[in-house]
Amino acid sequence: MRRKNTKTNYLLEKIASLLANEKRGKLLDLGCGDGDYSFRLKEPGFDVIAADLDEKRFKYRNEINFKVCDIAKPLPFPDEAFDYVIAAELIEHLKNPYAAIGEINRILKRSGQFILSTPNVLSLKSRLRYLFEGCLEYFREPPLEQSKNPKEVIFNLHLIPWRYPELEYLLVNSGFVIEGIFTSVYEGWGWGFVLPLILFQAWQKARRSLKKGGLDYRRINKILLSKELLFGRHLIVKVRKWGGVAGG
């Protein structure tokens, strides 16, 4: 039975749109939570398996295959078992993200796709919050105090604020090719008055580096100064496993 949700989940709909034109196949919703993402992606015909540590939160036991899974340990799936893996708002919670991303690569088929999202800590809104509060957007609660709350709250503990450059490094060094960078919804246009200063600083940094024979920042600056990174609520990255070509 379909469960109606009158409030639009922009992140969910964006992830669904990134898969809309892909060939249907076996999809793992890792860290599925209540299962809304799994249910949404099952509708257009994906063969969905949902996986999470807490089965009690999952709402679709009669409709979707659920697997109890501790993401901190090796995943309970064979090599190259899935065509697609999604991990929405998961990586910021992980204590050992390198091991987890390596496991995702292992269970993906050649040229399989992985879509992940995480709070966008490089947005203008987040940068200004850090300036005034000393904390980034979605990382306002002190982890030590929050960790003393009941166990169900610990599942929502944000540990690592992922900037795009570090996330890109993690993915590429785990055997993935970046295919696209997206966001869920744009916000914070009112903070655009600081944009000229940010653009000038980025230009100066790139210029000084090249002048001294250092790094070439032009590629990464194009990403960091994109509207997705400056005004997006979430950072969504779509990657493909090495070993195949798109559509292969």
Regions found by a protein language model. Give the residues of each.
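Conserved SAM-binding loop
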Residues: 14-20, 25-130, 236-241
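Acidic, Ala/Val/Gly-enriched low-complexity intrinsically disordered segments
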Residues: 245-246
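S-adenosyl-L-methionine-dependent methyltransferase catalytic module, highlighting the catalytic core
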Residues: 2-6, 10, 36, 40, ...
